Amino acid sequence: MELITILEKTVSPDRLELEAAQKFLERAAVENLPTFLVELSRVLANPGNSQVARVAAGLQIRLLTSKDPDIKAQYQQRWLAIDANARREVKNYVLQTLGTETYRPSSASQCVAGIACAEIPVSQWPELIPQLVANVTNPNSTEHMKESTLEAIGYICQDIDPEQLQDKSNEILTAIIQGMRKEEPSNNVKLAATNALLNSLEFTKANFDKESERHFIMQVVCEATQCPDTRVRVAALQNLVKIMSLYYQYMETYMGPALFAITIEAMKSDIDEVALQGIEFWSNVCDEEMDLAIEASEAAEQGRPPEHTSKFYAKGALQYLVPILTQTLTKQDENDDDDDWNPCKAAGVCLMLLSTCCEDDIVPHVLPFIKEHIKNPDWRYRDAAVMAFGSILEGPEPNQLKPLVIQAMPTLIELMKDPSVVVRDTTAWTVGRICELLPEAAINDVYLAPLLQCLIEGLSAEPRVASNVCWAFSSLAEAAYEAADVADDQEEPATYCLSSSFELIVQKLLETTDRPDGHQNNLRSSAYESLMEIVKNSAKDCYPAVQKTTLVIMERLQQVLQMESHIQSTSDRIQFNDLQSLLCATLQNVLWKVQHQDALQISDVVMASLLRMFQSTAGSGGVQEDALMAVSTLVEVLGGEFLKYMEAFKPFLGIGLKNYAECQVCLAAVGLVGDLCRALQSNILPFCDEVMQLLLENLGNENVHRSVKPQILSVFGDITLAIGGEFKKYLEVVLNTLQQASQAQVDKSDFDMVDYLNELRESCLEAYTGIVQGLKGDQENVHPDVMLVQPRVEFILSFIDHIAGDEDHTDGVVACAAGLIGDLCTAFGKDVLKLVEARPMIHELLTEGRRSKTNKAKTLATWATKELRKLKNQA
């Protein structure tokens, strides 16, 4: 009885009672978990207990599982370690509970699933699935029994690795289809079954491969889309959306007779959830068909037929889809919150996908709607017309769109002053897309001046409009810079089409970053990002404005650092950190543009601010990363002159290298070590012992994220290049580390791991290259220090030979391997020739490199081949 009373107190309005109850339960779980679980499951199984006690007991049992995969695995092990008798008792009680609960959702179904996900993978509880199937198919089962059992099946399918259920798919499907049939009187049962089907689709491939079973499943799902209960209808449509993605190749039989009509009807529904699924179906069709188009072009390049082919459903349905989608665009809500997903937003996304998928074919279907409504007195229609226009800018041939966009420019400029904020917002977004996708239409002589005028005014508009205007400026600056004329002997243009307005734009953006409503719609960060793009893409005659901007950013950074002591709340701290990060990133961008002599004048102040930031932000990884990146830029701009800051900066570099818990910070610190080596050359030597020790510790530490390790290996090469023969004292341990790293193996079916392996190999090759070049020296005569690597040359060439035989190698790996072969030839001469001759795959790798489309691989492979030929001629 005591347990029931305590469980009932877990919902007590009295805080003290509530805390006491929670403490009691936590203590009971620690003191004797098996007994505690048996007692809880007994409370859950007894229909005589209060609903509150039963729900609370179910919740306590469910706390045995977790959404976090690592914690979940620990909990599952903990459950399996409990005595088999206690486990059996708990399982019997939770199974008995199914069908006895009068409340929804069922607690027991979640408990059954939690236990099943721990036991089925280790071949325990074999009687569970047959028992669940019997609960559903037994004609005497109650509605509650069928519903809660189907819920349990759905949860198991959702949470377990699909491979674990492959051999049970027939039984599970039998139960699910039984619950979905149109003869089933209860909509609650139908809903539970339809949701369970949605979760089971991944592992029922064998059933979809068989025509008769597929027909039956499709028939039941299509019938469920006509159910009068909205919940069932939505769940059935969700199934169709997912089936389309998983089993596209089988859908031809059903598209004409059923799917087309069902989904078109759903799109027209006044019920948002139904309309959303109808639109989502066609968005998925586009996604699939775009993937198939890529597959087809890759197959054509390789001269083979594609494995799967597109049926071009999207293209065929355009004339029916576009009118519904454009009509749906007119249903927007004036006070719409950005986070609410609704049919109007989904229609915009679907139009964009159709545009990318069907290319030129979409234009004639959308154009009449745009022309008819872009000046409609009703703001909803004006907005829909602009939205439709913005949505079709990517996909069709730019030359087909350009005349239309140029023709629309005056109207769009006018709509930037529309009385409706929604229309202004959409127009600003559309102008941004034009600047990004068809910039020639924006930077033409006729419209550039009025466009700039309306964009500058737009920065003072509501945050949602101004935020889109910032993005338009970013794209415009990039396009203007690309289009500018650059003299042959110069790296950047002397002037460009934004020069005359440059100072005003920068001034307005700086004002925008300071707006009191800057936290709305991401406006502040959009304005800073836009400022960075504009400065990055500025011509030479804008330099005075860049100088001014640099001073403003430095001043702001100092002001922000002085605010630190006044921060009270967590939300203030978050805003403060965000602002520091934005200022750091902006500083980085302006420093890139600052001339060397100017950089020398401001570097003391910049470095003092950054050092202060490191002192104050030890707790914030994001800011540390941005500050390290800013130091990186300063190092590149100052070169050897950075040496004077090293003593003061060294401790913070160390903190960054040790901060492996936040791998982005650690990565930035490792990257910075490489920059320092390139800038300071041999002057980095006094700092190397400490840096090398930290780098080697990180390599040996299992808690360091794997992405950091390749970067560390390649930085060993940078260090050798900087300090030459002084690297000898680290050589043995580094060569052993490289030998170990170059023998790494990964699971080839995991594409992420294949990418990682290539990255790791590329880094090993870069490190070997740096070591050979650094020890060899850059004089005509090879320095004898390089002979310390001689005993490893055969291993290095075997490593390259192994890479050559691995068909997953990338162009980057080929380039690095070729470069290293060339360096080995110049360092060790004819010994290398013999070792290469014995490995014919290396020649194939060099041939592949010479034929590569990437410049680096081509150049290095050609050079390495020449070096080998030289040695052959000498021999």
Swiss-Prot record:
Ranges occupied by HEAT repeats: 2-31, 33-64, 84-122, 128-159, 169-201, 211-246, 252-301, 313-359, 363-393, 401-437, 448-484, 499-536, 543-591, 599-638, 643-680, 685-723, 731-775, 785-828, 830-872
Span list, region Ran-GTP binding: 333-418
Chain positions with N-acetylmethionine modification: 1
GO cellular component, one term: nuclear pore
Name of protein: Importin subunit beta-1
Principal location: cytoplasm
Domain Importin N-terminal, residue spans: 21-100
Subcellular location: Cytoplasm; Nucleus envelope
Ranges for region IAB-binding: 328-341
Keywords of this entry: Acetylation, ADP-ribosylation, Cytoplasm, Nucleus, Phosphoprotein, Protein transport, Repeat, Transport
Residues bearing the modification Phosphoserine: 12
Function text: Functions in nuclear protein import, either in association with an adapter protein, like an importin-alpha subunit, which binds to nuclear localization signals (NLS) in cargo substrates, or by acting as autonomous nuclear transport receptor. Acting autonomously, serves itself as NLS receptor. Docking of the importin/substrate complex to the nuclear pore complex (NPC) is mediated by KPNB1 through binding to nucleoporin FxFG repeats and the complex is subsequently translocated through the pore by an energy requiring, Ran-dependent mechanism.
Positions bearing N6-acetyllysine: 210, 834, 866
Family under the similarity heading: Belongs to the importin beta family. Importin beta-1 subfamily.
GO MF annotations, alphabetized: enzyme binding; Hsp90 protein binding; importin-alpha family protein binding; kinesin binding; nuclear import signal receptor activity; nuclear localization sequence binding; protein domain specific binding; protein-containing complex binding
Region of interest: Essential for high affinity interaction with RPL23A: 285-461
Originating gene: Kpnb1
Superkingdom of this protein's organism: Eukaryota
Matches recorded under PANTHER family: IMPORTIN BETA (PTHR10527)
Free-text description of this protein's post-translational modifications in UniProt: Mono-ADP-ribosylated by PARP16.
